[in-house]
C-alpha cells in the first residue's frame, strides 16, 4: 500500500469509515444467515 505524502487526513478517515461499515454489513449478514439457518 502506497501512502500519499499529503497532510490531508480526510481520505484515511473515509477509508476507515467504509471499512467499519463493510465489517458491520458482513456481521449483520452473518447474524441474519445464522438465524435463518437455525430456525
From Swiss-Prot:
One of its GO terms (biological process) is photosynthesis. It is found in: Cellular thylakoid membrane. It comes from the Bacteria. Keywords: Membrane, Photosynthesis, Photosystem II, Reaction center, Thylakoid, Transmembrane, Transmembrane helix. Its main location: membrane. One of its GO terms (cellular component) is plasma membrane-derived thylakoid membrane. The chain crosses the membrane at residues 18-38. Coiled coil: none annotated. It is a single-pass membrane protein. InterPro entries: PSII_PsbL, PSII_PsbL_sf. NCBIfam families: PRK00753.1 (NF001972). PSII is composed of 1 copy each of membrane proteins PsbA, PsbB, PsbC, PsbD, PsbE, PsbF, PsbH, PsbI, PsbJ, PsbK, PsbL, PsbM, PsbT, PsbX, PsbY, PsbZ, Psb30/Ycf12, peripheral proteins PsbO, CyanoQ (PsbQ), PsbU, PsbV and a large number of cofactors. It forms dimeric complexes. Belongs to the PsbL family. One of the components of the core complex of photosystem II (PSII). PSII is a light-driven water:plastoquinone oxidoreductase that uses light energy to abstract electrons from H(2)O, generating O(2) and a proton gradient subsequently used for ATP formation. It consists of a core antenna complex that captures photons, and an electron transfer chain that converts photonic excitation into a charge separation. This subunit is found at the monomer-monomer interface and is required for correct PSII assembly and/or dimerization. This is Photosystem II reaction center protein L.
Amino acid at each position: 500500500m502506497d501512502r500519499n505524502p499529503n497532510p490531508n487526513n480526510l481520505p484515511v478517515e473515509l477509508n476507515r469509515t467504509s471499512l467499519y461499515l463493510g465489517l458491520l454489513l458482513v456481521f449483520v449478514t452473518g447474524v441474519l444467515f445464522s438465524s435463518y439457518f437455525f430456525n
